[in-house]
Design a protein with these regions (language model features):
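Active-site ExK catalytic segment of metal-dependent nucleases
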Residues: 60-67
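Catalytic cores of nucleic-acid endonucleases
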Residues: 69-113
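Long, low-complexity, serine/threonine/proline-rich intrinsically disordered regulatory regions
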Residues: 3-5
């Protein structure tokens, strides 16, 4: 499915804003990819990803450039997205569709969002390729310490309770094959409960 129109309430002029795009975009992605989890406003280095889509074995960055946005920060955002995510998409309003390829790397996917009379039409203009700049040592930093602990337990690794988080990350990277670790990271992000994380972190501190 490359193109699909979704019907949502939005502003009546022809300009698409970020707030108009998000909800129908996420539904479109869920229909396209199947089982996914969408995490909004994810801190990504010194930038903030508009959204991150977690699949069974990949984490995909999503940057939204609505008709009201400019390219002013995009170069810097691209750098940080490419540090952390397996693939990346930029989603653009029609005002950007003609020139967006000039502003993102060739491996980035491009989705256009166009306002129709009865909804928003999404079209996958370019499929995302595997990000050649991705680094597992950066991707693993997306996880919190309790999530690393669960990965250690499932893979029968020492607890390293007295060691720093960076040391634990390095041991996991050294001991777990990369293909398996992609799935482990996705599993933790799928199960992440933001309402419980403070309690989990406090419980971990008390166990040390």
């Amino acid at each position: 499915m490359n193109a699909h129109t979704l019907r949502f309430a939005y502003n009546k002029d022809m300009t698409l804003y970020d707030r108009d795009i998000r909800e129908p975009l996420f539904q479109w992605l869920e229909e396209k990819y199947g089982m996914v989890r969408i995490i909004e406003e994810k801190q990504t280095g010194k930038a903030r990803a508009d959204a991150v889509m977690v699949t069974v074995d990949e984490v995909i960055g999503i940057e939204i450039k609505s008709d009201a946005d400019t390219y002013a920060r995009l170069e810097n955002q691209v750098k940080y997205y490419d540090w952390y995510y397996d693939r990346n998409y930029v989603v653009v309003g029609t005002s950007h569709a003609l020139h967006i390829e000039e502003h993102v790397p060739a491996w980035w996917g491009i989705i256009t969002a166009e306002k129709e009379a009865d909804g928003i039409d999404f079209y996958e203009m370019r499929k995302p390729q595997v990000n050649p700049k991705r680094k597992m040592k950066r991707k693993i930093t997306l996880l919190w310490r309790p999530e690393l602990v669960r990965i250690q337990k499932r893979n029968h690794l020492p607890a390293y309770k007295e060691k720093a988080k960076k040391f634990v990350q390095e041991r996991i990277l050294a001991k777990i094959p990369e293909e398996q670790l992609h799935r482990e990271i996705s599993r933790e992000l799928f199960e992440r409960d933001y309402t419980l994380i403070e309690a989990e972190l406090e419980e971990y501190r008390q166990r040390k």
